[in-house]
Amino acid sequence: MKNWIGIFVFALAGLTSTQVAGKPNILLIMADDMGYECVTANGGESYSTPNLDRLARGGMRFEHCYSQPICTPSRVQLMTGIYNQRNYIRFGLLDPAVTTFGHLAKRAGYATCIGGKWQLENGLKGPNHFGFDEYCLWQVTRRP
C-alpha cells in the first residue's frame, strides 16, 4: 500500500474488562487516502493486509458511508458525528464547544486514546480537551 506511514489511524480502546465491566474494547480505524479495494478482506488483490483482514473477520464492519474528498473535514466529521455543512467554522477547525466521540466514550466509562494525524487546528485546545486521556499524534498544531 502506498505510504502506510501516512495512514491515519484513530484508536479508541477500553483498557481492561475490569475497568469497563462487560463492555467491549473499541478500535476505530480511519485510513487517509485508502480505497475500499485496498484491503484483501474487501476483495482487493493488489495488497496483502492480513492484520486488517483479521480485524474485519472478528469485528463489526462499517461498509456503507460517505466521506469528504480531503482528510481534515473527514476527521472533523468523524470526531463529531455531524455533517460538515453543519459543523463547519473554517477548514481544519474542530470546534472546542462540540462533543466528540472521545467525550462520549469517557462518559460511558472507557479509557480513551487517539493515535495518528491530528491536524485539527484549535489553538490551545488539544486532544485532552476533546475527550482523550492519551495520544500519540503528529501535526497537533497547524504549520504556519
Task: Show the residue positions of the predicted features.
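Formylglycine-dependent sulfatase
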Residues: 2-5, 15-144
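Hydrophobic alpha-helical targeting segments used for export or membrane insertion
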Residues: 10-14
